[in-house]
Design a protein with these regions (language model features):
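Glycine-rich phosphate/adenylate-binding loop
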Residues: 1-130
């Protein structure tokens, strides 16, 4: 998602924190990432209806986005997808702020994911229960 001059790309499919248990049971290998809704619960809050129904073209006409944010987010998403498909993905969340000229990521480590879901590394490394 993106705002006027900033945005993020979030990868993940586990919709419950409990399902993250054992995600790092095999060292250096992650079997699941928290869903975007877990990473940023604010994404699940209903937005103003007028903002929901605007297309990218309408948003551009309304000057609701800077001229470069869509390209920056699309490039970041493409890079993350290619790395996911090639088995070289090391990050699960990337953020861009065009106004400040910054970009940063959250990396696929037990420490970083534990911080996002509010659980200790031990939870992520423990044996998953069926």
């Amino acid at each position: 998602g993106n705002h006027y001059e900033s945005g993020q790309v979030l990868l993940g499919s586990r919709s419950r924190i409990a399902d993250m248990k054992g995600a790092f049971q095999v060292p250096t290998f992650c079997t699941g990432l928290p869903s975007p809704g877990i990473q940023h619960p604010d994404l699940l809050v209903e937005q103003d209806l007028t903002k929901q129904i605007m297309s990218c073209e309408e948003a551009a006409i309304a000057n609701a986005q800077s001229m470069s944010i869509n390209q920056r987010i699309a490039n970041e998403a493409l890079d993350m997808l290619l790395r996911l498909l090639s088995g070289t993905l090391t990050r699960f969340a990337s953020y861009v702020n065009c106004k400040h000229g910054t970009a940063w990521s959250k990396f696929i480590t037990p420490e970083e994911i534990g911080s996002v879901i509010g659980k200790p590394e031990k939870f992520l490394k423990s044996k998953a229960t069926a």
